[in-house]
Amino acid sequence: MTRLDTPSMPSVDGVLQQSIHDIDIPPRPKIIDQIRAEMNSDAPNLRGIAGLINLDVSLAAGLIKTANSPYFGFGRRARSAHEALTMLGLDVTCRAIAAISLRRAFPNSAHYERFWHASASVATLSGWLAQQRRVPGVRADDAYTYGLFRDCGIVILLRRYPAYQGILAGANLDRDMPFTAVEQAALPTDHTVVGCLLAQNWWLPGEICAAIRHHHSLLALVEPVSPLKMPGRYLVAIAQTAEYLLQQLTGGSRTEEWAKLGPACCDLLALDDAGLAEICREAEPLLHLVE
């Protein structure tokens, strides 16, 4: 088994990093450290890891559900955490555990029910889009994980800054300034920096961390010299397109981000207007599967 390399860490400005030191980013779940330790051992103990996962019934159930997802297309269904772990492998299992743990990391998460449902919808549509567009270097589980974590910094800022709800509303509606510039005009940081730090701390892959950090940057999508490698650009384009589909299909909260980033996303995914309309029709049944 190839040992997992430490994810490359997208650079975060030192002043900003210091300014968010007290924002209370949720700690990394212990099970993630235990899985990573096994990934880097010469003889990973899958049964031992499955036993640890089984200590948390909801975690085990979530992992089994992940393994049985149509994203993977396994010929058989997992009936236990050990079977799910064997089918998925340690790398995907580690990301799946992080995704399952994310919502539970925030006390009183019911207050953010609308946010969690939107994130789950974007993640589901992102995984589906990665399959549909057959994007080079991006697996469906990568796109799903990224879609789920992309805006996690928003929840952290909502619980840290009482005024952030209004700042967020202003950023969503601003037609001219970049989303993060609106945040930075009122706060010492923005949700992409905070979300990137959480993703790094939770040992998500470097490309996912970088895509979280730069997902509101048009320049990162289109410039030849960019902080994002091509898989990271594709991740941003996939999730932004997924968000657009969600807004079109549900009439949910509209933002100005598609006007700013949509053309670049469509170029990356080789989508014209007709293709975008077609995937919008095809995506609608998926929303009924989101819990």
Tell where the protein language model's regions lie, with residue ranges.
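Conserved alpha-helical "signature site"
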Residues: 1-164, 177-258, 285
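Short, surface-exposed acidic
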Residues: 139-140, 206-209, 268-280
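Helix-termination/interfacial motifs at the ends of transmembrane alpha-helices
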Residues: 165-169
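GAF sensory/regulatory domain recognition
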Residues: 171-176
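Short helix/strand-capping connector loops at secondary-structure junctions
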Residues: 256-270
